[in-house]
Amino acid sequence: VKDSVYVGNAGKDAALDRGWILGHFKDVGDPRHSEAVEIKWGVHPRADARSQWVRGEERTALLVLISGRFRVELPGRSVLLEEQGDYVVWGRGVDHSWFAEEESVVLTVRWPSVPGYAAAEKDQSHPRT
């Protein structure tokens, strides 16, 4: 049972893998390995932005604001998350980008967990963002 349990701290563990705490990119055998879902604890300084839009999205995503002010850009629409617990969900085929209006912490859940979506090096998010 010990091998199928992992106890950690999202902030500390996220810092080790550019925010990602669960998904296909964790080692097989690690309870945090999953091809079904991926989870990110994103800590973003004020004015942090995704370096380029994600296009041809194959996943569904949920982004929940933990703290701060965070804007998600979607085709033809901008969504501003301002209160703790505000969230946005977008489905497959919806391109997106984001911008931290203030220092922000967001929790992102995406499914399924698939490789790809690399952003330019300037991006402080994980390549799977």
Where does each model-flagged region fall?
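Structural motif
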Residues: 69, 95, 103-105
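Short, surface-exposed beta-edge/turn micro-motifs
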Residues: 59-62, 85, 103-104
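Short histidine-centered beta-strand/loop micro-motifs
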Residues: 29-31, 50-57, 74, 80-81, ...
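A short, N-terminal "cap"/entry segment at the start of jelly-roll beta-barrel domains
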Residues: 1-46, 50-53, 122-129
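Short acidic-glycine-tyrosine-enriched beta hairpin
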Residues: 76-93
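Conserved hydrophobic/aromatic positions in well-ordered beta-strands
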Residues: 40-42, 63, 107
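Double-stranded beta-helix
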Residues: 3-6, 99-129
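Short, conserved beta-strand element in jelly-roll/cupin
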Residues: 55-72
